[in-house]
């Protein structure tokens, strides 16, 4: 076990003839590795200092000595006023951030039971908010100006071309589908009205014919009585 320290083949010598690792008995109770290597550490690293300005300059720095290394108070900070100023600036920034966060929380806090409904959440032209069992579309409500313009167009043209339908939709701020549906409904209404008028005219003509027949029969009866 002691062959590592006593083997002459593993030992090397300096120019002065001193051994780098002199043979020391492991069983010696007074062996101190720090004190043992301190002369060589002092000889090799004597007066070794750091040129970095962040480290303090100390003379006679000996590496491997038994005493602990004493770092300077200004090792990491060159100016002693840097740390207080940084703390003061950080405190102000933290205070402003806390105030902003509190104000934002005060603005955004709403009662839990209230749910805000935005316009994009509602269905267009729906008579009921939400998606229940009744999902029918509500009737499109046209303004008086839109209705008047559509009636004028229907008076001249019962059917529209695609080009004319696009022009009317752009003029009245409506969609092509709305124009198409309006004209379909208007044609149905017009047919009903025309059928009703024709029926009334037929009934009126039949009633007038019956009245004339009654008058003729009455005249003939009077003539027969006189005869």
Curated annotation (Swiss-Prot):
The keyword Ribosomal protein does not apply. SUPFAM superfamilies: Homeodomain-like (SSF46689). Its main location: nucleus. Gene3D superfamilies: Homeodomain-like. GO terms for cellular component: nucleus. Residues 200-227 are annotated as: Disordered. It comes from the Eukaryota. Sequence-specific transcription factor which is part of a developmental regulatory system that provides cells with specific positional identities on the anterior-posterior axis. Belongs to the Antp homeobox family. This is Homeobox protein Hox-C6b. It comes from Danio rerio. The gene is hoxc6b.
